[in-house]
Amino acid sequence: MSAPLKRTPLAEEHLAAGARMVDFGGWDMPLAYGSQLEEHHAVRQDAGMFDVSHMLNVDVGGADATAFLRRLVANDVARLATPGKALYSCMLNPQGGIIDDLIIYYFAPDQWRVVVNAGTADKDIAWMQRVAAADGFDVAIAPRRDLAMVAVQGPNARAKVWAARPAWQAASEPLAPFSAAAVEAGTLVARTGYTGEDGFEIVLPADAVVQLWRDLLAQGVRPCGLGARDTLRLEAGMNLYGQDMDELVHPDQAGLSWTVALKDEARRFVGRDAIEQFAVPRAFVGLKLQERGVMRAHMPVRCAQGMGELTSGTMSPTLGVSVGFARVPVGVQPGDAVEVEIRGKWVPALVCKLPFVRHGKAVEHS
């Protein structure tokens, strides 16, 4: 018998709003509250909010916290010197495969926070503890299931958060992208997101999230589900763990080589040896379909250099055409013509540099 689905502190709010709920990584999460298309456009044109409380915040502290994270992840946290600053990274296995992608926040040399994906949270914690024990790091790893998280995204997102919580504006208005600030005790506001739009991700005590959700709703922020979250992140050129990459995929094969810091040769992060010895046999590209149809994951892609495969695909609400990501042979370049097999028919597609949409506007590809 399968385990019951986990629920976030906002579960009753979703049900009361008529959300269609689905199993997402073992969590009962809203797919949509009505029109997925309208939710998508709300984020691109105004403001939408997502319950992301299924994601796990993990506090990492102790005398060796910085050294531990420099060993644990492929990006180099040593570049973070300003409290509240964050970076995106992959956590790799010894073979160079991606255990998870995550965001790491710096507060002090002995005080960090790591945000991991919901479906990999237990695996991630076990791996972090294993690395800490293997190398004898003096570090405390504390999962924070007492916290909830809401992402408010869109061109008007920040203004509507401030309308709902005026006291937060002074601390959060100066934030640069990929930075966070404590706006009150136990509450962190970060200028981050997963949509390609401006906005905040707000981490706060679980017992305070329902009132925040209701207050944002009163300011006209539209609740959005996983369906819109997926089309938004695809347009923005952002990977989804478990779909675009996993433990068998190296960062280079998922368009994430920019998250691997190799400059400091003395920093032997987990997976570095495999990364340095591995010749990348696949490239990761965006595709835009040139005729009618919808690309989906696992569809074959025919290129002049050989065969590839879609990892993600959807109909783009902003562009009105199907877009997707594909792993293809090395040598495939933006501007190349390829074909995607859809229902037994080979349909032409254009290879594009990501993203497809930036700040609500289509990115020109030729």
From Swiss-Prot:
It catalyses: N(6)-[(R)-S(8)-aminomethyldihydrolipoyl]-L-lysyl-[protein] + (6S)-5,6,7,8-tetrahydrofolate = N(6)-[(R)-dihydrolipoyl]-L-lysyl-[protein] + (6R)-5,10-methylene-5,6,7,8-tetrahydrofolate + NH4(+). It holds the Pfam family GCV_T_C. This is Aminomethyltransferase. One of its GO terms (cellular component) is cytosol. Its EC number is 2.1.2.10. The keyword Hydrolase does not apply. The lineage of its organism: Bacteria, Pseudomonadati, Pseudomonadota, Betaproteobacteria, Burkholderiales. SUPFAM superfamilies: Aminomethyltransferase beta-barrel domain, Folate-binding domain. One of its GO terms (molecular function) is transaminase activity. The glycine cleavage system catalyzes the degradation of glycine. Belongs to the GcvT family. One of its GO terms (biological process) is glycine decarboxylation via glycine cleavage system.
